[in-house]
Amino acid sequence: MLQTGNYSLVLSLQFLLLSYDLFVNSFSELLRMAPVIQLVLFIIQDIAILFNIIIIFLMFFNTFVFQAGLVNLLFHKFKGTIILTSVYLALSISLHVWVMNVRWKNSSSFSWTNGLQTLFVFQRLAAVLYCYFYKRTAVRLGDPRFYQDSLWLRKEFMQVRR
């Protein structure tokens, strides 16, 4: 079971990684004149998103619901976050690769193709949704019902068996 102190530490780590993601999304364009620094920030951002995915799944594995074999229940409750986080990671990596390819040789020019602008808008839109759904999931996983046997869990188990 996830202890209160451990949960606070994990939640703080998740929010720190989300804050870094927000920081890079907000200020990375200011560093377009320094492509190496921008590349490092992008790599760390993608790793932070990946760490957030790993942390969420570790929190899933730690629940009583998962240990009782109700993986479908967890997936059903949190599938939006799982899918959105995966899409956001793919959009972020795609945007970072495209931006670095366009700007690496000539960082002083302002070159935005229509496709790059479209990808940029979708990545930023996904970033907002990712932050909201990820924070909601992280807080919802603190619910004690997920970590102990309860009447709610028994009802869910009976519905799954039908």
UniProtKB/Swiss-Prot annotation:
Spans traversing the lipid bilayer: 7-27, 41-61, 80-100, 115-134
GO biological process, one term: cilium assembly
Disulfide bonds: none
Topological type in the membrane: Multi-pass membrane protein
Subcellular location: Vacuole membrane; Cell projection, Cilium
Keywords for this protein: Cell projection, Cilium, Cilium biogenesis/degradation, Glycoprotein, Membrane, Transmembrane, Transmembrane helix, Vacuole
GO cellular component, one term: cilium
InterPro entries named among the record's database cross-references: TM_138
Pfam entry (one): TMEM138
Main location class: membrane
Residues carrying a glycan: N6
Family stated for the protein in its record: Belongs to the TMEM138 family.
Record's function text: Required for ciliogenesis.
Official protein name in the record: Transmembrane protein 138
Biological source species: Mus musculus (Mouse)
